A protein has these predicted regions:
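Short donor-sugar binding/catalytic loops of nucleotide-sugar-dependent glycosyltransferases
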Residues: 190
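Short, hydrophobic beta-strand segments that form beta-sheet elements in well-ordered domains
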Residues: 38-41
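Alpha/beta enzyme core
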Residues: 2-34, 44-184, 193-225
Length: 228
């Protein structure tokens, strides 16, 4: 793929609660210059990023507890409101493994309602899950209306080819079953073109439409250096 096409899929990420105004300005400047899909920051930084970004750069915000999620819906709602007030049009959040089916669906349904009209990306932390758990988490997220299933936070392991395949297959299964076309966000330790291309090959082997139809995002902080 052309590097410009890869840049157009990139969620350029700065997840540092201590990031300075200059740090955010630098990342937003890179995003504006190179036409990435979005800038991804924490919810409390969305307002600053939005003020500095051009109209073509979308602001995505990680809302709620991170990198570990929670079973308490309330811990997500105020950060979501803060992100939206700051100008975020996309929300990333963690579905914490091990909280149980009932709590998971309560969180997912609640955050979907709170983000109506925005792109919702649900992080399912594939590095600490086996195949059955990855597929189950992806199915729950898709059933609740997630626009993207994101492979991991990157704080508890990286994105593997195996997990990439499992999530891709669940997105395809969801489309075949419901007719709904969801997306996928590859994230976690993606630092160079070789690593990225290996994951893209897996996605393409399962369902090229995820890539060709603009339903793929790449979450990374340093990958941009390999693309510009």
């Amino acid at each position: 793929m052309k590097r410009t096409d890869l840049l157009a899929m990139l969620d350029l990420t700065l997840l540092d609660r201590n990031a300075s105004e200059q740090d955010i300005h630098r990342v937003v400047g890179l995003a504006d210059e190179h036409g990435v899909a979005a800038v991804c920051v924490f919810s409390e930084q969305a307002g600053l990023a939005s003020k500095q970004a051009s109209s073509r750069t979308r602001i995505a915000a990680v809302a709620g507890p991170f990198p570990k999620g929670a079973a308490d819906l309330e811990r997500y709602l105020l950060p979501i409101q803060e992100a939206i007030a700051g100008g975020a049009v996309e929300i990333d959040l963690v579905l914490e493994p091990g909280i149980g089916l009932e709590a998971s669906m309560m969180v997912l349904n609640g955050v979907r309602m709170a983000t109506e009209g925005l792109a919702l990306k649900v992080i399912i932390e594939t590095p600490i899950l086996d195949e059955r758990a990855v597929r189950g988490a992806a199915r729950m997220a898709l059933m609740a209306g997630a626009d993207f299933v994101k492979t991991c936070t990157g704080r508890r392991g990286g994105c593997s080819k195996e997990a990439t395949r499992w999530v891709s297959e669940e997105i395809r299964r969801h489309e075949v079953t419901t007719g709904e076309r969801a997306g996928m966000k590859l994230s976690g330790g993606i630092r160079d073109l070789d690593g990225l291309n290996g994951l893209l090959d897996v996605v393409r082997s399962v369902d090229p439409g995820i890539i060709d139809q603009g339903r793929l995002r790449i979450g990374a902080s340093s990958l941009i250096e390999s693309l510009i």
